[in-house]
Amino acid sequence: MKYSDLRDFIAQLESRELLKRIDYPVSPHLEMTVVSDKVLRSGGPALLFTNTPNYNMPVLTNLFGTVERVALGMGEESIVALREIGKLLAALKEPDPPKGFKDAFSKLPLLKQALNMAPKYVSGAECQTHVWEKDEVDLTLLPIQTCWPGDVAPLITWGLVTTRGPHQSRENMGIYRQQLLSKNKLIMRWLSHRGGALDYQAWQQEYPQERFPVAVTLGADPATILAAVTPVPDTLSEYAFAGLLRGQRTRLTRCIGNDLHVPASAEIVLEGYLEPGNEAPEGPYGDHTGYYNEVQSFPVFTVERITHRDKPIYHSTYTGRPPDEPAILGVALNEVFIPLLQKQFPEIVDFYLPPEGCSYRLAVVTIKKQYPGHAKRIMMAVWSFLRQFMYTKFVIVCDDDVDARNWQDVIWAMTTRMDPSRDTVMVENTPIDYLDFASPVSGLGSKMGMDATSKWPGETQREWGKPITMDEDVLNRVNSYWSLLGLK
């Protein structure tokens, strides 16, 4: 599905009956979470709350509440096509050397298409139609959700944060939640390994006394949002990748108060800065783990300016015990990850991040095993190849006769092909999600790999069991007279 901006995407979803307008008054304080959660768990549509009490702005939720809508946001019609996007990323990340002139010529369209999707810079952008500055800046006028009863304050959840480190031309995009502190202040919660945090660390080293410019986009088009959470190779900007997904170049405009760029069609943009040394305790908040997270200090984001379109739409979500919107997004992105992994490790048959494992804390991998110890190599590969799997605590490796997405298959393999002592790998003192309160130290914990493959000589001294299967000719013979047995 091709679209130009968020509003065009909303209109097309509505025409397909994949978006529902809610005209009944629903409060962003807790009530929207209940409605959105019930609809998401039933596989229902995206929601546009048009009557938000005490606010003059509609709220969009559940935009990516089904895998189908994630695929549509990536310009595709089905989840199957997301594998092709993964293959595109794999080709751009590590292109194969051409096998000859004909092969080199066939690769030119892909390269040309990527180069032609460089962002287009414009002035007079829609997102700057209205400007709030100085005393006009008031974040409390935005219908920011309070998602759970124990949340300390309203929380921006779909903020697309743009930063740039010193001496860098490429801008970084990331999704970081932001706690409302006051009319012009938010807390920027980003983990130390994320792009925005790394830019800020580099800035503080280079300019220890100077303010760090930041821009936050609320209500970008889906392709730009999805590009920010996809493992785009360093050779391609997120904006160029968004253009590839959308089928047209991303239109960017320069912020009014700094030299960062934001999507021209964005609904709302927050411009401001981080002051070195200015931090505040963030949380607690209900999170995607299904628990409230502990309180930690993060930088304070001072908002100097708010710009927006005519009649802006506020884009929001909630996070909680799966399934939630990030979990659905994780299921879709799982399909994008597979070709990236297979490019580097062709023996991988399937890779699955179960949503009930918070979409990243547990991975099941099936492989065509080729030698003793092969499963352990794959464990290390998962933990190290893509930064998205840095926090994956458990990796289960099975043979390719096992369905990675069927727990009955996986549990059967674990209980029949594993010896707990021989086939379990423990790695201590590794990076762990700060939200993982089960780890003994915040941000540092252990990982477990489980080898549920059949064992080869060198891995066992015993004769290995042969799986039970029925003869094919017997199956065919019984199937031929099955309808005569009076059985369903």
Curated annotation (Swiss-Prot):
**What Pfam family does this protein match (any one)?**
UbiD
Q: Which NCBIfam families match?
A: PRK10922.1, UbiD family decarboxylase
Q: Specify the species.
A: Legionella pneumophila (strain Paris)
Q: What Gene3D superfamilies does this protein map onto?
A: Single helix bin, UbiD C-terminal domain-like
Regarding protein family, the annotation reads:
Belongs to the UbiD family.
* Name used for this protein in its record: 3-octaprenyl-4-hydroxybenzoate carboxy-lyase
Give cofactor(s), names only.
prenylated FMN; Mn(2+)
Give the bilayer topology.
Answer: Peripheral membrane protein
| Subunit | Homohexamer.
The role this protein plays is: Catalyzes the decarboxylation of 3-octaprenyl-4-hydroxy benzoate to 2-octaprenylphenol, an intermediate step in ubiquinone biosynthesis.
Family matches, as PANTHER family: 3-OCTAPRENYL-4-HYDROXYBENZOATE CARBOXY-LYASE-RELATED (PTHR30108), FERULIC ACID DECARBOXYLASE 1 (PTHR30108:SF17)
